Amino acid sequence: RNNEPIIIKNDEFRKCILFISFPIYDYKEEELKILKDVIFDRSEKYDTKRKLAIACINNYCLSYRSKISFIGNNAFLEFALIYPSVASLKKDVLQDNLLFAREMIFNPYLENGVFSEKLVRESIEMYKEGVKNKLKRYDGYCQYKNDLLIDENDYLVSKVFKDLSLLSNVTSERLYNVYKKIISGPPLTFLIGNVDEKKSKELVKEIILDNKISNVKFETDYNVYVKNISNSVEVVRENSEFSTSSVCCNYKVRDMCCYRDRVLLTIVKNLLSSNNSDVLF
């Protein structure tokens, strides 16, 4: 498909959500894990946490984030930004927030022409601590072992999570080269909320896409999520130092290969459990 901005108008929303997603065609997972944190930490213009916080207030930016999304066999570097709608704020701040997003995405904070080595090291240590803390909790450990049981191709459990030593390969220079390669391609853009569709599309094209419309190629294959069906029941028991016990059950879904099935599975999951982190297979 081409990267023409997609505007989804909904008058009931009091907030507007902007998504900017860059397809990633060639990557090392350990680099992406750190890249998403380094990019939105600060920028060339907002080179301190204080300046960034003030910019958010001035632009009425309610929240922003960057993350890596994996959909089928595709990876995306995704940026999301939320701001009040015209109806709730009595003021249109779309242009201000688009300019803010452009600054954060295309003008990252650099030192000596590459990402800050200090920020990269901090992000690596934060990721390591997050992994260690998850495995210290009985529920996190149980989910990890559960995913390992059914995950043959690293779709549920990342290679980095299983082997933190991979992060030693990440350097500020390599990370910056990866970043430049990713953002050199056309992004997919979505704007959802109570907006003026025509005006919004023109602003997104001008500020984010630089009026360049081109094709974006990616594949959809949901079969990668599903392990081959087994006719036998496999039971795994493990003793640990946790004082609390935890039980995980996996149910395989046959022939889940389209988006519709994934939506229905999410609904069934929420009906059967109050915990939105539970996944049925």
Spans of model-derived segments:
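M16 family metallopeptidases and their MPP-like homologs
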Residues: 13-32, 37, 49-103, 132, ...
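Extracytoplasmic/secreted envelope proteins and their assembly/folding machinery
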Residues: 32, 49, 53-56, 98, ...
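Catalytic Zn2+-binding segment of zinc metalloproteases
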Residues: 38-46
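Acidic/histidine-enriched alpha-helical segments
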Residues: 49-54, 100, 107-132, 216-227
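An aromatic/glycine/proline-enriched structural segment found at the starts
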Residues: 1, 150-161, 165-166, 181-256
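N- or domain-start disorder-to-order transition segments that initiate the globular core
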Residues: 1-16
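A conserved active-site cap/scaffold subdomain adjacent to cofactor or substrate pockets
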Residues: 244, 254-257, 261-274
